[in-house]
Design a protein with these regions (language model features):
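N-terminal Rossmann-like NAD(P)+-binding subdomain of aldehyde/semialdehyde dehydrogenases
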Residues: 1-119
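Short acidic-hydrophobic, aromatic-tinged amphipathic segments that line or gate anion-handling sites
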Residues: 2-7, 178-183, 303-308
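Flexible, glycine/charged-enriched surface loops at secondary-structure junctions
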Residues: 98-105, 225, 262-267, 287-297, ...
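Conserved small-residue-rich beta-alpha loop and adjacent elements
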Residues: 103-169
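Conserved NAD(P)+-binding/catalytic subdomain of aldehyde/semialdehyde dehydrogenases
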Residues: 175-263
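A glycine- and small/hydrophobic-rich beta-loop-beta segment
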Residues: 258, 266-341
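C-terminal core of ALDH-fold dehydrogenases
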Residues: 318-426
Length: 426
């Protein structure tokens, strides 16, 4: 990890730059795959599965027999953990249900909103180096609460044509309707355009590598919406001299093991803590099963010493981290000053991994500085709010003249006339 001591504000932009994600260079490859999936459907998806995932498939859909077999293969202790996590995720997201209120803006004019679920959603669960069954819970649970009628899940199979049993178990528990053996760009294309097997959806959710990110960006231009721009995972720990260096190092490494392009940052007012964390990171790194991945990620990571907490907060809001852990003496007070972050973890006993799995909050969060404009996945991500209005004779007589004046000044005479004919019809 690179150490930076008392950086000038002019250095912040370069210092806080994320690892580059060059999706532009992938555009031709991604477009070719998407075009073939759009025109050839299942056949193209199956061919790309053989080329990219090295698996020969006869069909894409996961069968009931495979679901039953998977449930038997999940250890009891893992089932219990998944059930606990799903219960907490359900509780947190169910509390977000929208209750629209009718508002009378003036006598005779009543306006309100109604929350309606997106009917068809697609969830992408990456393969890669670890089975992300937790992401299944994070995406499918709020979709189920929202009332989405069709919840479609795509995830790449292994070379034997099987999906990790924990992914299938979590999907069934969280209410997924249909599961398909497809990964990468071809999976995004299948959900965006529809194939003989895979239904076309209206919105696609889920993380992925740079190819998946590029594919989601491309299909979002015309065909579907997506959850948010995605990039490599990241964490910032904001700490003072009271923080436990063992805890801080563990938190930094828990993010670093996600992938070689992940980023972990310590921002602290204590030089002593920075030195202790640097030592602890190296000590704990040697004990990790994924130490090679974490070690490469640490090359993108930084230990930053700042002069005071005001500077630390300003720097944090500029960085806008996906995950922010605050380990300071007055963490509640400092948390109130945070305006740009995906998810915030307060105090020494709130590790970021709690949010990744079982506290109940969602771990699908904005990265790459997008926390300045985006929030994480929530129940709102799976619904639309339709507005309604009802106007009586009293109401149109009150607001009608203002509408006529405004429409006339915008030179929209038909707009004006739509009100005028009603005012005259007494």
């Amino acid at each position: 990890m690179k150490k930076i001591i008392y950086p000038d504000k002019a250095e912040w932009a370069d210092m806080l730059r994320r690892p580059a994600l060059h999706t532009e260079t992938l555009r031709d490859t991604v477009k070719e795959v998407l075009d073939r999936v759009k025109s050839e459907g299942d056949r193209a998806v199956i061919e790309y599965e053989e080329r990219f995932d090295k698996v020969k498939l006869d069909a894409l859909a996961v069968t009931e027999a495979e679901m039953a077999e998977a449930e038997k293969d999940v250890p009891i202790e893992l089932k219990a953990a998944i059930m606990l996590a799903q219960k907490n995720i359900h509780a947190f997201h169910a509390a977000q249900r929208f209750e629209g209120k009718k508002v009378q803006t003036v006598p005779g004019v009543t306006c309100w909103q109604k929350a309606v679920a997106i009917e068809k959603v697609g969830l992408y669960i990456p393969g890669g180096t670890a089975p992300l069954f937790s992401t299944v819970l994070m995406l499918a649970t709020p979709a189920q609460i929202a009332g989405c009628k069709e919840i479609v899940l795509c995830t790449p199979p292994d070379k034997a044509g099987k999906i990790h049993p924990a992914i299938l178990y979590a999907a069934k528990l969280a209410g997924v309707n249909k599961i398909f053996k497809a990964g990468g760009v071809q999976a995004i294309g299948a959900m965006a355009y529809g194939t003989e097997s895979v239904p076309k959806v209206y919105k696609i959710f889920g993380p992925g590598n740079q190819y998946v990110t590029a594919a989601k960006q491309q299909v979002s231009l015309c065909d579907v919406t997506i959850d948010m721009p995605a990039g490599p995972s990241e964490v910032e720990v904001l700490a003072d001299e009271t923080a436990n260096p063992v805890f801080v190092a563990a938190d930094l490494l828990s993010q670093a093991e996600h992938g070689v392009d992940s980023q972990a940052m310590l921002v602290t007012t204590s030089e002593k803590l920075m030195e202790e964390v640097e030592y602890e990171v190296q000590r704990q790194l040697a004990l990790l099963s994924r130490w090679e991945i974490a070690e490469k990620s640490l090359a993108n990571s930084k230990l930053i010493l700042v002069k005071d907490m005001d500077e630390a907060i300003a720097l944090t809001n500029e960085y806008a981290p996906e995950h922010l852990i605050i380990e300071t003496r007055d963490y509640e007070e400092q948390a109130e000053r945070i305006v740009n972050a995906g998810s915030v973890f307060l105090g020494s006993l709130s590790p970021e991994s709690a949010g990744d799995y079982a506290s109940g909050t969602n771990h699908t969060l904005p990265t790459n500085g997008y926390a300045k404009a985006y929030g994480g996945v929530s129940l709102d991500s799976f619904i639309r709010k339709i507005t309604f209005q009802e106007i009586t004779r009293e109401g149109i007589e009150i607001i009608g003249p203002a509408i006529e004046v405004m429409a006339a000044n915008e030179q929209l005479s038909a707009h004006k006339n739509a009100v005028t004919v009603r005012l005259k019809a007494k």
